[in-house]
Amino acid sequence: KTTFIKKYASYLLKKGMNIGILENDFGAVNVDMMLLQDLMGDNCELEMVSGGCDADCHRRRFKTKLIAMGMCGYDRVIVEPSGIFDVDEFFDALHEEPLDKWYEIGNVIAIVDAKLAEDFSAEADYLLASEVADAGCVLLSRSQEATEEEIHSTKEHLNRALGQIQCKRRLDSEIMDKNWDDFT
């Protein structure tokens, strides 16, 4: 995820945009923030919501950060969830006041390992499905390291997980499995 965010943020900065990146992490040390530090500058700010508290506290912290960032006048705000994230929390927050007046959801991009394991628990499959259900596109990470069979298996797993949560959507052309270095 961080590699993609770094590439995407660099692209937006080259376009002259003023951006904010919100790292949503549950770890004590946020490695992602350290990896993104070199993007910081006049047109890019990094913020973090750290975990270590209950779900209600985390939702309050997340919303508070989004409110503060909403007052900064960014052209784009990139929200990076932790590896396991309740996507409903994101959508719910953006539909509450005052965020509903400041933010418009643009691109929802889900990033999934091209070599996704087959043996997920029901809970993990639920989280996986919730993360891809509303995505405009699903980017497979490390696709250049995966075989055609592994990529096909990952695509089947995504659609099976969607079916398990009674989601009628099936992913096909929304899944991008090319090397990220080839993106323009």
Feature map (PLM): residue ranges:
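P-loop NTP-binding site
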Residues: K1-S10, E174-T184
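Nucleotide-state-sensitive switch-loop elements of NTP-binding domains
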Residues: T2-S121
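Phosphate/Mg2+-binding loops and adjacent switch elements
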Residues: C72, R76-L171, M176
